[in-house]
Amino acid sequence: MNRLDGKIAFVSGAARGIGAATARLMVDAGAKVAIGDLLDERGHETARSLKEAGGQSVYVHLDVTRADDWGAAIAATVAHFGGLDILVNNAGIFLAKDLEESTKADWERLCGVNLTGVILGTQTALPALRESGAASPQGSAIINLSSMVGLVGSAMAPLYSLTKGGITSFTKSMALEFARKRYRIRVNSIHPGIIDDEMGGQAIAARARMKGEADMELAHAQASAAHPIGRLGTVTDIAHGIVFLASDDAGFMTGSALVVDGGWTAQ
């Protein structure tokens, strides 16, 4: 039996990167997966590739900052697959500016995607997750994408760090609220280090600017070396952690922070 046999998942920001890798591993583990994103062409392509590989997947357009988009996306998922067991709040953006450079518009965009998106997703999916959780021995699951800088500070991206810290706190609060209300919904966060993908490239470029380093190849090597394990993370590294948190193997975990950062925060 596969780890997620019979489960139905929704993954936001899943047209590429960690989200797409998560959708792929979830399908491989037996789940039916709806993917939501703003990037319609890439999103349809990702869903199509999952179906061509023998999985069940559907793409829905989603702007995570809009409550009506969330309502339509979750409704479409439930209508298409018959329910919802897993929500992965993956969509996020990066801002590499210090406080003095940042504008109110920067903050509003960052907060809209990284915080409002997680809140709206959780709120909208809650009725479907409550229903499926009540019928499952280990309950349903929410996994929120935070960051290693949601646990420690960041000199190069303080407002990004603030939003990721907010996700960490929100995760713990929702775990406690749902437990108090006897909802069978587990809520956990995952905290990546620097990942070798598009957003990771933005983080490496920001570190290079902060250090006055113009050689991006050297900056990449320095970022790799900054992780005690000696390399950057991959999207698959994080996707494996998400699949674990979504599965019954994590049935005794709620309000937890799964750190997958190559040892960065151990220093």
Regions found by a protein language model. Name each.
Residues 122, 163, 171:
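Active-site helix of classical SDR
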